[in-house]
């Protein structure tokens, strides 16, 4: 069992994955990662993400980064479980940018 992820390890994941992006990509965090980065709780068991657009290079980098940082990463977002809400991209909150990878909290309204 891997240890819970705190904000620093999630930010390290952001830096590591950002180094791999060869073009502009958006990554949306959902669930536990959002709760940790916003400060609602100290840790999470995994990081749920959505990439737009999906790129082979980032998908290939994920297993290596997951192992290096000893973390679980799931490709999951609310639009896989409920109908996509109109305007969700506009409501997604910008976190920061690492290289060519921009990080957002997936629309909190859709996560509720």
Predicted regions and their residues:
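Compositionally biased terminal segments of proteins
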Residues: 1-112
């Amino acid at each position: 069992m891997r240890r819970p992820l705190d904000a620093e390890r999630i930010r390290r994941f952001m830096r590591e994955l950002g180094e791999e992006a060869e073009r502009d990509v958006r990554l949306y965090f959902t669930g536990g990662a959002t709760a940790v980065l916003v400060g609602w709780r100290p840790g999470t068991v995994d990081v749920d993400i959505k990439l737009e657009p999906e790129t082979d290079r980032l998908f290939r980098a994920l297993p290596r980064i997951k192992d290096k940082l000893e973390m679980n990463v799931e490709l999951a977002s609310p639009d896989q479980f409920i109908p996509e809400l109109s305007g969700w991209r506009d409501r997604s909150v910008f976190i920061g940018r690492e290289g060519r990878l921009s990080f957002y909290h997936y629309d909190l309204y859709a996560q509720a």
